[in-house]
UniProtKB/Swiss-Prot annotation:
One of its GO terms (cellular component) is P-body. Residues 1-82, 212-242, 530-565, 712-849, 977-996 are annotated as: Disordered. Keywords: Coiled coil, Cytoplasm, Stress response. Residues 1-14 have a biased composition (Basic residues). This is Stress response protein NST1. InterPro entries: MAP7_domain-containing, NST1. Belongs to the NST1 family.
Length: 1334
């Protein structure tokens, strides 16, 4: 015994228990959980006890059995049924529809196999039953003898076996005939009847018959008295015999009540006894006993049959095996097998010899233990382990469903009328999906869903009527929800809640079984109300019948007989210590007493009919087996099946009790008996399948627990590895031989298949060859026909091609002729066009020559007129001047007009020639450039009005600025361009308060600015010529020549005319040449500039000022308007201050930046001053600004000698500087630059206008030093602060100094609103920087 057994016993004593302990065994707790459990903790530890050891080594403490203990154990049976009920119901509910269908599909062969197997089994066990009869105690000998005599008497009169009676036909043949007859009868009613449907209909008939049976008039009390009276004369008994009889009666009642519901036990007895009475009265079977004793014995036998039916059912069905002794099976298991089993038990169960022997004895008594042991010995337990694994997997998926039962009568009738009801229950859908739909598509939370279920459960509970067993006052929606919850995935929880509510409400009125039954019946009514409208289709398929029959069985069996299966399963588990872990020890212990009683009852089975030559007990035993199978399987159909099977069994026995085949039983009764027997057989098959399925599930759990024990015993297995290895080798050898046999069989089959395949291939090849020949013949014929058609097609195409070529040839010839005519016509048209073109050219040339000649004459006439007008102007000037005209001509000989100037004549001719040329017709645009070059030159004619020796050259400072004003020309290219434009109106700007005409510098004194305007006369004399130059815009296109022709004409003209003519006067400025510089050139001298002005009667300098000696640059030819590459030379009279502007010098350094030209052709300046960049030289250049030098020079001349603080009037200085052809804007900008450079000082009045300027004397080096832009800015800002001057760009008064240059009437500076000077003086010529070439 293991060392820990004492600890187990000590624990048992500490608990103080006195009842039997049984360990969970290998399959429940494992090796490590060895404890002694007490059923009743309040009792003391049993003093009369038996200490045993379980096969797995656990200690078992059992008290000695006593009668009170047995009675108490039997009383506890009903309380332990509820646990099994839940397990069985859960197992059936969790079976898949396919598994349920498989259980309900019963074939004909299976029915007859079941009949044959149980018939043979009962025949083979006749000897065993006889031996059991001999073991009965002495107290039962009298009873057994009496019954034996009765049996002998029955034998002499008639035989009840399946061979001797009737037509001496075997039972199997008779049942097959009856089966076929019943099947044909069913087929006459149903065309689509099959064997499966036939079997299910038989079960339905059984259920219907149960509901229609009439209760017998006899009472159970009278029957019991009759049984007692029949037994009392035969027993001659002692007290022990009476005790045995009482025990037998008590045992019989308890067993019947155990397997049937309490309400149906008395009804079943009445029906059986009534049936027996009717049969006996009908056949009048003679018996040797007196009438009273016979009736008593029959009643006693009938009661005995009821119990024997149930007990034999337990043993023979394999669900609860009856214990057998070792002597009964001595012939089955020999000594050698016993020794092997004993060694196995010692190795794997327990090393204790007593325990091992006990295991072998139980194994011999129970075939399932023997099968398990053989599997462990032969296959190393692989089958058992696999079964355990499957069981565990199924157990994990298994859930217990609510304890709801459906009344068999209602559900059977409903499903009989609506065969598809079970399937449509599944079609209701998931309850959660339905609630989601009711909740507008939003799923309920878990709490809301639980609350809804609880509400429906309470509503159903309150609406249940215990009298009518129906739900009243429930809405259709509540019924729908109830049905979906009952069939949903969480139906177990919902069912538990429903059941609990019913128990709480009706626990005082109803028992638990009645609650479940009532609830199921009412639930089936609700479900039927929901589903029944959907049973539209009356055509039931085989699967549908299987399914709803399955549900029918489930419903009917759940109503009445779940308690029976609970006991069956527990009874069976008690016999195997190996499988005893599924239920606790209390459930198994209660069957110990029952097994003892079974041993006693088995000894009394000889009370049934027995024959000397035949085994008459076979039939009755068979019926008993079938009847009890009804009661033992999963609990389905137990009541109806047992009830009906008991009747069939009794009926069949009584029928056999008739004397002979020629009895009064007709064919209909035979068929009815066969139907009942088939009902019993089919019911037994269904019950066996359900129980097998259930035990398979349970075995899976047992397997997993056994695996745990096997792992715990791994150390023991290592010690005996050699023995196992030999066994495994033997098993492998057997498997190898079996595999070899299978392989040979497989090879034979493959060879046969190969041979058949080759034969088939040969036949196929022959067929294909025949087919190929047929196809080739057909193809050959088809090809010939195709060739013939192709040949015909080719001939047709050749003919069509020939006709097409003929048509094409004709068409080609026509096209050639048409093209030839078109070419000739085009040639003639071309010749005609050429002739017309030549004629037109000749006409144009003649017209052009005429036009040129006319233009030349017009130019000569205009030039002549101009010269005449010039002479007149000069004469008028000379007459108005104080100086005589002759002296004036003598002083300025260069101003005399040169009438024979060839250049002037050529200039007019070229202008006349180019004016007729169209700009767009010139490919090189030279004509356009020539026009611009002409426009960029202005003819500087002699200005006689500026040289007036007698007019007085002294200027007065009084009214110089007030009487003079400046006017500005419009923004045109220059004077010539403005005159050439015929559309420009010759308007004259107002001259203000001055009476002096514009362009006049004939000043006789400082107080008078009067003088004749020679410049105006000069411009007027030039108008005809300039107008002629612009006449090309109206020349017609047809009179134009190409540019090349015109150029050639001009070249020829120039070549024939001498260009060597010299000017008659040396000092005169010649006209600018056409091919000369594009920049501004002076064509004449200005007498007004020939002398320097001096204050207070200083003599005028007689040296004339030319463009070279006043510092105005003489530009050279430029290729574009942006070209400033040519250097500019400045010369300033006798001072010889010269400088050159480099090619990289920007144009803005020459043109004042304060007033920029608004366009590139305008010689004037903009009205918008640009003060941000005053006119200063680049500090990096070693240059001096010539305009600044002019201002300084004029200022120094106006300043008295040796006077350092003398201020000069700014108006006088402005007049002197502007006499050098400098714009006022340039003058003022340079004046500000000089002030910023601290070379001059400026004085202003209260209005901020510059009134006086003073020269600041510095050294010569500082005078020549270039101005710095930063210093200029700083000094400018400082000067503004010192003198309170406003910035030049200031617009405080809303006025801005502006200039307008190159007006047609002269150059005028308009500063009427200026902050600096309020002057309106005209100047004779525009600024030298008034065009883009300067």
């Amino acid at each position: 015994m293991p060392s820990h057994s004492k600890n187990k016993k000590r624990k048992s004593k500490s608990k103080g228990g006195s009842t039997v302990k049984k360990s969970g065994g290998l399959l429940e707790k494992g090796i490590g959980n060895i404890t002694a459990e007490l059923y009743n903790d309040t009792d003391d530890y049993p003093t009369s006890r038996v200490i045993k050891r379980a096969p797995n080594g656990d200690v078992i403490v059992e008290s000695l059995p006593t009668k009170p203990k047995k009675s108490k154990s039997r009383q506890t049976n009903s309380s332990s049924n509820n646990d099994m009920i839940l397990d069985l119901d859960s197992h059936w509910e969790w079976l898949s529809p396919e598994e349920k269908k498989n259980i309900l599909r019963i074939d004909k062969d299976e029915v007859f196999e079941m009949l044959s197997r149980y018939n043979n089994h009962n025949s083979n066990n006749v000897n065993g039953n006889t031996n059991n009869n001999n073991i009965i105690g002495t107290g039962s000998n009298n009873l057994s003898g009496g019954i034996s005599t009765n049996s002998n008497n029955n034998t002499s009169s008639s035989c009840n076996c399946n061979v001797c009676g009737r037509r001496h036909m075997a039972m199997d043949q008779e049942m097959e005939r009856i089966y076929n007859r019943l099947y044909e009868m069913q087929r006459e009613n149903y065309e689509d009847m099959t064997h499966i449907k036939f079997h299910l209909n038989i079960i339905k008939d059984l259920q219907k018959r149960k509901t229609q049976m009439i209760s017998p008039p006899a009472s159970p009390e009278m029957d019991s008295n009759n049984v007692d009276e029949a037994r009392e004369p035969n027993s001659g008994s002692s007290n022990e015999s009476l005790d045995i009889k009482n025990d037998l009666e008590t045992m019989r009642d308890e067993v019947v009540k155990y397997f049937l519901s309490p309400n149906s036990v008395d009804t079943l007895k009445k029906e059986v006894l009534n049936f027996k009475h009717n049969k006996q009265k009908q056949f009048q079977t003679p018996i040797s006993l007196n009438e009273d004793n016979t009736e008593e014995v029959v009643e006693d036998n009938e009661a005995q049959h009821i119990y024997d039916d149930l007990s034999n059912e337990i043993h023979d069905s394999g669900l609860i095996e009856s214990p057998r002794t070792v002597e009964d099976d001595a012939n089955i298991i020999d000594i050698e097998s016993k020794s092997r089993y004993l060694n196995f038990a010692k190795t794997f169960i327990s090393s204790h010899p007593t325990i091992a022997q006990e295991y072998v004895n139980k194994m011999i008594m129970y075939p399932e233990m023997k099968e398990l042991t053989d599997d462990l010995m032969n296959n190393n337990g692989s089958g058992f382990i696999k079964a355990i694994e499957e069981f565990v997997l199924d157990k994990q998926k298994q859930n217990t469903l609510p304890d709801t039962e459906i009344d068999i009568n209602d559900v059977n009738s409903q499903q009989h009328e609506n065969p598809e009801e079970a399937l449509q229950v599944q079609d209701l859908g998931d309850a959660k999906e339905f609630t989601t739909m009711l909740h507008n598509g939003q799923p309920l939370t878990s709490d809301e869903y639980a609350n809804l279920q609880r509400h429906i459960a309470e509503r159903v509970t309150d609406a249940y009527n215990t009298e009518t067993k129906e739900f009243e006052g429930i809405s259709q929606l509540e019924k729908e929800l109830f049905t979906r919850f009952m069939h949903g995935s969480d139906r177990r929880q919902f069912g538990d809640s429903i059941l609990q509510l019913f128990k709480n409400k009706y626990d005082d009125k109803l028992s638990a079984n009645s609650i479940s039954t009532s609830l199921a019946a009412a639930a089936s009514t609700i479900t039927h109300d929901i589903i029944s409208p959907r049973n539209d289709d009356g055509n039931d398929t085989e699967e549908d019948i299987d399914y709803y029959d399955d549900e029918d069985d489930v419903s009917s069996e759940n109503i009445h007989h779940r308690n029976d299966l609970d006991d069956d399963f527990k009874s069976r588990e008690e016999y195997s210590d190996y499988n005893s872990d599924f239920h606790d020890n209390r459930k198994c212990e209660k069957y110990n007493d029952f097994d003892d009683d079974d041993d006693y009852l088995d000894n009394n089975r000889n009370l049934e009919c027995a024959h000397a030559e035949h085994n008459h007990e076979t039939l009755s035993t068979y019926h008993h087996d079938v009847d009890l199978a009804d009661s033992n399987s999963h609990g389905y159909k137990n009541y109806a099946s047992h009830h009906t099977s008991s009747q069939v069994s009794e009926d069949y026995i009584d029928d056999i009790d008739d004397d002979g085949y020629e009895s009064g039983i007709d064919e209909n009764e035979r068929l009815e008996e066969g139907r009942k027997l088939l009902q019993i057989t089919i019911t037994k098959i269904l019950q066996r399948r359900i129980m097998e399925s259930y035990h398979a599930k349970q075995a899976e759990n047992n397997r997993m627990k056994l695996l745990e024990e096997l792992e715990a015993e791994e150390s023991k297995k290592k010690e005996k590895e050699e023995k196992k290895q030999r066994k495994r080798e033997k098993e492998k050898e057997k498997k190898r031989l079996l595999q070899v046999a299978k392989e040979e069989e497989r090879k034979k089959k493959e060879e046969e298949a190969e041979r058949l395949k080759k034969e088939a291939e040969e036949r196929e090849m022959e067929r294909r060859e025949t087919q190929r020949k047929k196809v080739e013949a057909a193809k050959k014929k088809k090809d010939e026909e195709k060739k013939r058609k192709l040949e015909e097609q080719r001939k047709r195409e050749e003919e069509q091609e020939r006709q097409r070529k003929i048509k094409e040839e004709q068409k080609r010839k026509k096209d050639e002729e048409r093209k030839q005519k078109e070419l000739e016509k085009k040639k003639k048209d071309e010749e005609k066009r050429i002739q017309e073109e030549e004629k037109r050219k000749k006409e144009e040339e003649a017209e052009q020559k005429t036009l040129n000649e006319k233009k030349r004459l017009d130019v000569e006439i205009m030039e002549q007129k101009r010269l005449e007008e010039e002479e007149k102007r000069l004469k008028s000037t000379a007459s108005t001047s104080n100086v005589p005209y002759a002296e004036l001509l003598k002083m300025t000989p260069s101003l005399q007009p040169v009438s024979g100037n060839i250049n002037d004549e050529l200039f007019g001719m070229i202008n006349a020639a180019t004016s007729s040329q169209s700009i767009p017709t010139s490919s090189s645009h030279l004509n356009h450039l020539l026009q611009q070059n002409d426009a960029s030159h202005f003819n500087m004619t002699p200005r006689h009005d500026l040289l007036n020796p007698s007019g007085g050259m002294h200027f007065g400072p009084s009214d110089l600025i007030e009487q003079s004003h400046f006017t500005h020309k419009s923004n045109s290219f220059d004077t010539l361009a403005a005159i050439n434009d015929p559309t420009t109106p010759q308007t004259t700007l107002p001259y203000g308060n001055s009476s002096v005409p514009p362009n006049s510098f004939d000043i006789s004194s400082w107080g008078n600015f009067n003088g004749s305007s020679t410049a105006e006369t000069q411009l007027q004399s030039q108008l005809p010529q300039q107008s002629l130059l612009g006449s090309h815009s109206v020349t017609s296109d047809q009179n134009r020549k190409s540019f090349n022709e015109e150029l050639n004409t001009i070249t020829n003209l120039l070549s024939t005319t001498g260009l060597e003519d010299q000017l008659s006067q040396k000092d005169s400025f010649a006209h600018s040449s056409l091919w000369g510089s594009q920049g501004t050139s002076l064509s004449g001298s200005n007498p007004n500039l020939s002398s320097n002005f001096a204050p207070a009667g200083l003599p005028i300098n007689q040296t004339p000022i030319s463009p070279g000696n006043i510092g105005i640059p003489t530009t050279t030819h430029r290729s574009s308007i942006w070209d400033i590459s040519s250097g500019v030379d400045y010369s300033l009279n006798d001072n010889k201050i010269t400088g050159s502007i480099q090619s990289e010098r920007p144009l803005s350094n020459v043109i004042p930046s304060s007033y920029m030209s608004p366009n590139i052709w305008s010689g004037g300046t903009s009205k918008i001053p640009v003060i941000e960049q005053p006119l200063v030289f680049n500090p990096n250049e070693n240059q001096t600004n010539p305009i600044s030098n002019i201002i300084l020079r004029e200022l120094s001349l106006l300043t008295l000698p040796n006077s350092t603080d003398q201020y000069v009037s700014s108006e006088l200085l402005c007049q002197k500087v502007m006499a050098n052809r400098i714009d006022y804007g340039v003058y003022f900008t340079e004046l500000m630059n000089l002030r910023n450079a601290h070379k001059i000082e400026i004085a202003s009045n209260d209005n901020g206008q510059v009134t006086h300027v003073k020269l600041v004397y510095k050294s010569k080096d500082e005078l020549e030093m270039p101005l710095n832009s930063s210093e200029n800015q700083n000094s400018h800002i400082q000067m503004q602060q010192n003198y309170g001057l406003q910035p030049i760009s200031s617009t405080t008064a809303g006025n801005t100094a502006s200039t307008t240059a190159n007006n047609a009437n002269g150059s005028t500076i308009n500063t009427s609103n200026s902050h600096f000077f309020n002057i309106n003086k005209t100047i004779s010529n525009p600024s030298v920087t008034a065009n883009i070439w300067s």
